[in-house]
UniProtKB/Swiss-Prot annotation:
Cellular localization per UniProt: Cytoplasm; Mitochondrion; Nucleus
Name of the protein in question: Ubiquitin-like modifier-activating enzyme 1
Region (2 approximate repeats): 63-611
Biased composition (Polar residues): 21-38
Protein encoded by which gene: UBA1
Pathway: Protein modification; protein ubiquitination
Gene3D superfamilies listed in its UniProt record: NAD(P)-binding Rossmann-like Domain (3.40.50.720), Ubiquitin-activating enzyme E1, FCCH domain (2.40.30.180), Ubiquitin-activating enzyme E1, inactive adenylation domain, subdomain 1 (3.50.50.80), Ubiquitin-activating enzyme E1, inactive adenylation domain, subdomain 2 (3.40.50.12550), Ubiquitin-activating enzyme E1, SCCH domain (1.10.10.2660), Ubiquitin-activating enzyme E1, UFD domain (3.10.290.60)
Length: 1058
């Protein structure tokens, strides 16, 4: 899953401002965003009171200001069954000020179905008191206390947010009225078997600072008309992305300068590149340029109290295929509360008498309901299903509703993201058996064991089947931890012959602790898979988890081989990159195993289920590739901070990693030069010049030499190169058409003058000199004063721009220039490189970029290098936090989204284990908790293809036994003849991986040689690799013609050799 990274948002405080649509000068309507600190090393551009090491990934979702507001909010969570503990876990990880756990009940067997911090020895103990020490471990910044008294008003008044879970309606109404009258924000959450309910009341005057959390859009202006209203046209490089009603501000407009620095202006979108603003008819004429930026304007939203909203509800849809269901469930849940009040228990599982009574109660509730709620026709089957499962308690439903509820708590605390207005209902009845008659009351009776809450919904047969499952979990990060927790709760792999195999090669880092909730501070540096397996064993001692530390890929196919996959019942991906996802998808298609796929990005998440012979696979559809930045934009014409940050990352690699690697290869590999000369274009020249610089021209002998190098490099990049660029293209340069060269996306730069008293200049030298020293194994220094003193004695050669230097304006120009290479310069370089014999024992130390260690100078270099270049081009700088997001390609993450997404994954798991065969039983899902938005759809069926009268999908293949009855292996000729006689197909090309084994245009001599060779011998010869003993079959790809000579698309071949 890919999307634009989210950025830090500004905080807006005070009353709700009223930005105008008139174009009058700004009157400080919105607070100004503080400029990025100039001294990245001194202040790191970070907030002193937020632990950025811990909250790093969450800060990219919420921003610093929302995070600060979160840290001033005390939250009460009432009810510590499975739903309550899920909400408490997520908000404690999120970092609120304090959490109080309230429960007057004791742990029962049924609670263990989903309450992951209760153990069998806790039966009979107070749920809040038992859970408190285990929840408190999650985040040392959040005090967690337990309270077992009544919810009296004096007690409630000490909280900013109150969360009620699994509570009687009578209590909800009483607490709701009190909270609404006192401005205390209220979240009510409830789960009943396969059903969930959520309600929010954040008061009558809540200030919403940012409704969607997306990075404010910004684009370049190409024209503004003098009109009423004025029409703005943007450069046609990309659509502006604005919506009508958005507010924007302008900067750098030439001519119509009245727009610059204006208060936010409301716009109306006219097209993908145009929108109208205010009356510009009296403004100056527009000349050129300008940047228009979206402004997040705070707005006031109002909530009804619980009692008022009960009578006049507003619903957030979770599934548009169930459009009428929220209103039906609104009646059903009220009837359920009446049933529980009358009987002091929920309806018995699958009990017809109780179901009939609930239907009667629902009719009564409906008949007395207000006109806004009353249903013309009550869905009595739905009400009966509610009765049948209401006694159940399912970990996946609690994970989903708990993730949503915890996100609502964070919205209540921070004013960030649009809250649920005000009711949300959810059901997953598709999880029930497709054979509706297979469940009976007897099968759903409690067994006095930890799975009673689940048996109440699905019966004992599924419980036994879950226990026998053998699943492969790939990844033990955020999604992996949540999956393991859910697996433990539902009993997956907990029975005889059951097993979960989890693999992850990573170790635990501090930034993981904020959302990978199975890990603790004392686990940092330990292996994720081992630690997660041990932690989940505490939650359910019956779970059988085997932990591995292997990366999945061709290199580990000897471990995850045919025998391994054939014993599996399914695979769950918990990966963070597309390549690994696609690899596992291919493996699952090949071995015909179900795959549960999911991913998150900030508040966004997605779930996909892949079922053999039924659905398409993960790789059947792909996101469009991310747009890359043109090389010439990076090298000479940046116009956004993203460009300067990517340039700084390239600088890091080109200064501190690649030259050191090339030098080490040159000194140890006699064929290095020969191999380098075979590279394309100007690469041989660039590589050998870098080796020469590292070993001859720039070889430092001391720390002072490193400081000198850093100072010279500063001048090269931020003064000399810019002066050369301006020599080639002066500020007043015109294009061949007479237009200014420096216009549109090309920003005219200016050279910088080195100033040792400028903290940013000294930051750069400190970081660059230390990293340069590190590559040579020299000791560095953190003494800024000493470095400043050294810099005063550095002699910087005078620079004069040269004539005849070619600077490429486009990537096409660059490519054509790179096609030729100066052979005489190459020969000269080869002659001047020192012989490896003369440098015995010398080696360099390449540096791998590590963004999360603030002491290693890596981010110090990136921030300084990027912001200096930004200053060259008058681009607003970025602080360390934003720089780390972009340069480090960080994926924003928050525990709430992960919990909700994994809840949905495990609902699909129920269906997979039961063997559902109807496509409409399964649900692919997408959610965005910030909006909030939920979208569910049936998976797409596997696309069908045909040759002759034979239909096939990606799940089909030709099965060919390579070993014949006489014990000899099939030759290429026999293979070709087999397809001609058995399938009436003439093979025109045959390949294995990237190796071409046969083609119709192959030279006659080579073809004659191969025809009588065994297939595996040809594969080994062409690929130059011996087949491992673990390889039992080869995947062969075919191009074929039918009998009429037409190309036909056919499946691949599984060619069995053992």
């Amino acid at each position: 899953m890919s999307s634009s990274p989210l950025s830090k948002k500004r905080r807006v405080s005070g009353p709700d401002p009223k930005p105008g649509s008139n174009c009058s000068p700004a009157q400080s309507v919105l607070p100004q965003v503080p400029s990025a600190p100039t001294n990245g090393m001194a202040k790191n551009g970070s907030e002193a009171d937020i632990d950025e090491g811990l909250y790093s990934r969450q800060l990219y979702v919420l921003g610093h200001e929302a995070m600060k507001r979160l840290q001033t909010s005390s939250v009460l969570v009432s009810g510590l069954r499975g739903l309550g503990v899920e909400i408490a876990k997520n908000i404690i990880l999120g970092g609120v000020k304090a959490v109080t756990l309230h429960d007057q009940g004791t742990a029962q067997w049924a609670d263990l179905s989903s309450q992951f911090y209760l153990r069998e020895e806790d039966i009979g103990k107070n749920r809040a008191e038992v859970s408190q020490p285990r929840l408190a471990e999650l985040n040392s910044y959040v005090p967690v206390t337990a309270y077992t008294g009544p919810l009296v008003e004096d007690f409630l008044s000490g909280f900013q947010v109150v969360v009620l879970t699994n509570s009687p309606l009578e209590d909800q109404l009483r607490v709701g009225e009190f909270c609404h009258s006192r401005g205390i924000k209220l979240v009510v959450a409830d789960t009943r078997g396969l059903f969930g309910q959520l309600f929010c009341d954040f008061g009558e005057e809540m200030i919403l600072t940012d409704s969607n959390g997306e990075q404010p859009l910004s684009t370049m202006v190409s024209m503004v008309t003098k009109d009423n209203p004025g029409v703005v046209t943007c450069l046609d490089e990309a659509r502006h992305g604005f919506e009508s009603g958005d507010f924007v501000s302008f900067s750098e407009v030439q001519g119509m300068t009245e727009l610059n620095g204006n208060q936010p202006i409301e716009i109306k979108v006219l097209g993908p590149y145009t929108f109208s603003i205010c009356d510009t008819s009296n403004f100056s004429d527009y000349i050129r340029g300008g940047i228009v930026s979206q402004v997040k304007v705070p707005k006031k939203i109002s909530f009804k109290s619980l009692s008022a909203s009960l009578a006049e509800p507003d619903f957030v849809m979770t599934d548009f295929a169930k459009f009428s269901r929220p209103a039906q469930l609104h009646i059903g849940f009220q009837a359920l509360h009446k049933f529980c009040a009358q009987h002091s228990r929920p309806p018995r599982p699958r009990n017809e008498e109780d179901a009939a009574e609930l239907v009667t109660l629902a009719r009564a509730v409906n008949s007395k309901a207000s006109s806004a709620v009353q249903q013309d026709s009550l869905d009595e089957d739905l009400i009966r299903n509610l009765a049948f499962v209401a006694a159940g308690d399912l970990a996946p439903i609690n994970a989903f509703i708990g993730g949503l509820a915890a996100q609502e708590v964070m919205k209540a605390c921070s004013g960030k993201f649009m809250p649920i207005m005000q009711w949300l209902y959810f059901d997953a009845l598709e999880c029930l058996p497709e054979d509706k008659e297979s469940l009976t009351e007897d099968k759903c009776l409690p067994r006095q064991n930890r799975y009673d809450g689940q048996v109440a919904v699905f019966g004992s047969d599924l419980q036994e089947k879950l226990g026998r499952q053998k699943y492969f979990l790939v990844g033990a990060g955020a999604i992996g931890c949540e999956l393991l927790k859910n697996f433990a709760m539902i009993g997956l792999g907990c029975g005889e012959n059951g097993e979960i195999i989890v693999t992850d090669m990573d170790t635990i880092e501090k930034s993981n602790l904020n959302r990978q909730f199975l890990f603790r501070p004392w686990d940092v540096t330990k292996l994720k898979s081992d630690t997660a397996a041990a932690a989940v064993h505490q939650m359910n001692p019956h779970i059988r988890v085997t932990s591995h530390q292997n990366r999945v890929g061709p290199d580990t196919e000897r471990i995850y081989d045919d025998d391994f996959f054939q014993t599996l019942d399914g695979v769950a991906n918990a990966l963070d990159n597309v390549d690994a996802r696609m690899y596992m998808d291919r493996r699952c298609v090949y071995y015909r195993k179900p795959l549960l796929e999911s991913g998150t990005l900030g508040t966004k998440g997605n779930v996909q289920v892949v079922i053999p012979f039924l659905t398409e696979s993960y790789s059947s559809s792909q996101d469009p590739p991310e747009k890359s930045i043109p090389i010439c934009t990076l090298k000479n014409f940046p116009n956004a901070i993203e460009h300067t940050l990517q340039w700084a990352r390239d600088e890091f690699e080109g200064l501190f990693k690649q030259p050191a690697e090339n030098v080490n290869q040159y000194l140890t590999d006699p064929k290095f030069v020969e191999r380098t000369l075979r590279l394309a274009g100007t690469q041989p020249l660039e590589v050998l010049e870098a080796v020469q610089r590292s070993l001859v021209l720039q070889l430092p002998q001391s720390w002072a030499d490193c400081v000198t190098w850093a100072c010279h490099h500063w001048h090269t990049q931020y003064s000399n190169n810019i002066r050369q660029l301006l020599h080639n293209f002066p500020p007043d340069q015109l294009t061949s058409s007479g237009a200014p060269f420096w216009s549109g996306p090309k920003r005219c730069p200016h050279p910088l003058t080195f100033d040792v008293s400028n903290p940013l200049h000294l930051d750069y030298v400190m970081a660059a000199a230390n990293l340069f020293a590190q590559t040579y194994g020299l000791a560095g220094s953190q003494d800024r004063a000493a470095v400043a003193t050294l810099l005063q004695s550095v002699q910087v050669p005078e620079f004069t721009p040269k004539s005849g230097v070619k600077i490429h304006v486009s990537d096409q120009e660059l490519q054509s220039a790179n096609a030729s290479v100066d052979d005489s310069r190459l020969e000269e370089l080869k002659a001047t490189l020192p012989s490896p014999d003369k440098l015995p024992g010398f080696k360099m130390y390449p540096i791998d970029f590590e963004k999360d260690d603030d002491s290693n100078f890596h981010m110090d270099f990136i921030v300084a290098a990027s912001n200096l270049r930004a200053e060259n081009y008058d681009i607003p700088p970025a602080d360390r936090h934003k720089s780390k997001l972009i340069a480090g390609k960080i994926i924003p993450a928050i525990a709430t989204t992960t919990a909700a997404v994994v809840g949905l994954v495990c609902l699909e798991l129920y269906k997979v284990v039961q063997g559902h065969r109807h496509l409409d039983s399964y649900k692919n899902g997408f959610l965005n908790l910030a909006l909030p938005f939920f979208g569910f759809s049936e998976p797409l069926a596997a696309p069908r293809h045909q040759y002759y009268n034979q239909e096939w999908t990606l799940w089909d293949r030709f099965e060919v036994q390579g070993l014949q009855p006489n014990g000899e292996e099939m030759t290429l000729k026999q293979f070709l003849d087999y397809f001609k006689t058995e399938h009436k197909l003439e093979i025109t090309m045959l390949s294995q991986g990237v190796s071409m084994l046969y083609s119709f245009f192959m030279p006659a001599a080579k073809l004659k040689e191969r025809l009588d060779q065994p297939m595996t011998e040809i594969v080994s010869r062409v690929s130059k690799r011996k087949l491992g003993r673990h390889v039992r079959a080869l995947v062969l790809e075919l191009c074929c013609n039918d009998e009429s000579g037409e190309d036909v698309e056919v499946p691949y071949v599984r060619y069995t050799i053992r």
